[in-house]
From Swiss-Prot:
Residues 139-267 form the CRIM domain. GO terms for biological process: cellular response to insulin stimulus; negative regulation of Ras protein signal transduction; regulation of cellular response to oxidative stress; TORC2 signaling. Phosphatidylinositol 3,4,5-trisphosphate (PI(3,4,5)P3) promotes MTOR activation by relieving MAPKAP1/SIN1-mediated inhibition of MTOR that takes place in absence of PI(3,4,5)P3. Belongs to the SIN1 family. The gene is MAPKAP1. Component of the mechanistic target of rapamycin complex 2 (mTORC2), which transduces signals from growth factors to pathways involved in proliferation, cytoskeletal organization, lipogenesis and anabolic output. In response to growth factors, mTORC2 phosphorylates and activates AGC protein kinase family members, including AKT (AKT1, AKT2 and AKT3), PKC (PRKCA, PRKCB and PRKCE) and SGK1. In contrast to mTORC1, mTORC2 is nutrient-insensitive. Residues 279-353 are annotated as: SIN1-type RBD. GO terms for molecular function: enzyme-substrate adaptor activity; phosphatidic acid binding; phosphatidylinositol-3,4,5-trisphosphate binding; phosphatidylinositol-3,4-bisphosphate binding; phosphatidylinositol-3,5-bisphosphate binding; phosphatidylinositol-4,5-bisphosphate binding; protein kinase binding; small GTPase binding. It holds the Pfam family SIN1_PH. This is Target of rapamycin complex 2 subunit MAPKAP1. InterPro entries: CRIM_dom, PH-like_dom_sf, Sin1/Avo1, Sin1_N, Sin1_PH_dom. It comes from Gallus gallus.
Amino acid sequence: MAFLDNPTIILAHIRQSHVTSDDTGMCEMVLIDHDVDLEKFNPSSTYGDSASETQGSNGETQGYVYSQSVDITSSWDFGIRRRSNTAQRLERLRKERQNQIKCKNVQWKDRNTSYSAEELSSLFEKKNFRVRSPCSGKQSILSVRLEQCPLQLNNPFNEYSKFDGKGHVGTTATKKIDVYLPLHANQDKLQPMTVVTIANAKVHDLIGLICWQYTSEGREPKLNDNVSAYCLHIAEDDGEVDTDFPPLDSNEPIHKFGFSTLALVEKYSSPGLAAKQSLFVRINAAHGFSLIQVDSMKVTMKDILQKALKRRKGSQRGSGPQYRLEKQSEPNVPVDLDCTLESQSTLEFCLVRENSSRGEEISEEDPQIDIATVQDMLSSHHYKSFKVSMIHRLRFTTDVQLGISGDKVEIDPVTNQKASTKFWIKQKPISIDSELLCACDLVEEKSPSHAIFKLTYLSNHDYKHLYFESDAATVNEIVLKVNYILESRASTARAEYFAQKQRKLNRRTSFSFQKEKKSGQQ
């Protein structure tokens, strides 16, 4: 053991002792004292004479020189040491193995046969690259493809190609639609063109995509460069355009409509053609009526009958019961199917089954339908939302948004952050298909600011009723809109609902009649 009073030597001894034992390097960070190092270069000025000052300075400087370890540096790079020989050797072996994988060893073998000088020269023939061979005139694959598809370069609808969903199937929501093109008037049977579009595209974008694909495939006749000249209509599976409904709104997203078959129709701006589009023929039947749109008064009654039978659910051409047309004002007088509509002097007819007759009480008193009523009926299938209050049991109400379209009725709760929902019923969203709707009736109308209506629909083989309240104007508009939709559709659920309602009424009437009969006998 040695007694030392020089802190510099003690610090150097501690540093050198921990070099080989401290793997973390923490001792180097803890024992680095910058204040001690500064005192070596700035000795105190309290020494008496210069000799002692010089001697002390030399001694401290010498102690500072020997106090620093070779492996320790007073910097932020402490703890960094050189790699060991084993690690360097392993790294070198790893690189050699990687280089051996890239190299291929070929074993030299003496040839068994002798080759002539000409054969040896042909193996490694010297080529003169300065002399270029004449161009053979062979076109590249890109040039051939550009010549085969000249229309793609001059396609005026290229801006709508970004809505093509064929390259996004599986990654983005897409929608596959069969589009009929009635522009081919000379073809007997139309073939649809399958278009795949992204789901967030609008109807206007879909029209542009259809025109782009039509032009890219080189179809004839050529289309108008203006996309606004076309519109999309609902079409049947055989390609017949359903003109009873207006075209799809060009500003609405395509995923809002559930139709898988559409038709691209050119708009008509001529006043004469516009008048033709407003020409409707009313066909009365046993359970409602249908509106058949015709192009002109020159159409034959046979065509009108075929359209009416096709509109009627379950009636197919060549099978099932046969029907005839009669004027609404002339019962039991069949109409000549070879005559034109212009010769009938009326736009209202009645569809009657063969070997049957309609009673005299059938509605000769029905008012003539005007064009305003037709427009209201056609616009009833457009989507529109209303803010109403849904009535629960115990007269609790919940604010909901009632969305009505020709396909379904949606009931979405309106979130109100200010109102406390602790003691109130939490309404869930409800979606009702139009095929399941049965009735929409006005329950009460107490004042212009308060009215209640009832919506009846089929759910799990049971009829459910929903009650709503709002102002009288909104309620009347909702009831009229829903009833227009119900009248234009041949719903099985609605027919069963009214049949069941009639049976209950008959049983009630029969029971009351028997009760009165027994009381009279007594």
